[in-house]
Every structure is written in structure tokens, then in C-alpha cells.
């Protein structure tokens, strides 16, 4: 936690899996803003819906009382291996609705990879959308990050968006 504070950060994405309660306690004490997320990553597996639902329920039940949590993350880079399809979108709607049923006070989000694209319907299911962009890292042109975000904001001026990963492997 000390290193995070030294960086001047006030927001932490606890990505891809459940984290120790001790760290959530540290985040509460330090006044951090936390994004908690289930490990629904890279590929949608049609037979995995019950697993994602179970993990989301457990994440919320175990961490609901932590003041640090501002949003529940429903997936990460889900379109890397899975082309956009109805079952994947349906599962995102199920998870998003579940989060709001279990916790009416917090937002939902997901982390999209660039190939998801700003017009992909999955990017518009949750309350917030964030992008894992490595423009300027894997491909030249750091300025492309600004262009990406400006374009998204131009198309969707009332949509909350952010960076979820960037640079040296996030």
C-alpha cells in the first residue's frame, strides 16, 4: 500500500480474481477507490455462465461492506478470443443486473481491449466502460490513446469512460 501511496495513486483496480480481505481493509483505511472484478477474462465460455454468476455473487457478498469499493467489474478483455455474440452479451446483462440487484449503491464496469471497439454493444452494458489500451507501447504513437478517448467521447459524450490498463503491461 505504501508504494501505491508514494506513486500518488488513489484508485486501484483489483483485477481478475478475488483478493485477500487484508488488502481491502488497507484500502478502506487509506481511503482508496477500488474496482473489484471477477475472473471472466478473454474468452466467453457458453457453459461457464453459472460460474461467472457464482463468482460475482461471492465477490459482492464478501466485499459489500468495504467502503473502498466504487464499482464491480464484470469482465476483462472478453472480446479478445470471443467474437461478439448474443450469449456473451446476455451473460454481461445477467452479471450487470445481478450487481445492481445485490448492490444498488455501486456502479458496474468492464475492461475492454481495443479490438472491442467503441461501437461494440458489449461496451455499453455496464454503467462505466474502461479500455485496456497499449497504444504507444505495443504499437508506436502514444498520442493514439488521446485520439481513441477523444473519439469515444465525441461519439458518446454522456458515457463515463476511463483507462483500465496502459503502458508496461498495465
Task: Go through the PLM ranges and name each one.
Residues 2-4, 11-170:
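Substrate-binding/catalytic cleft of secreted carbohydrate-active enzymes
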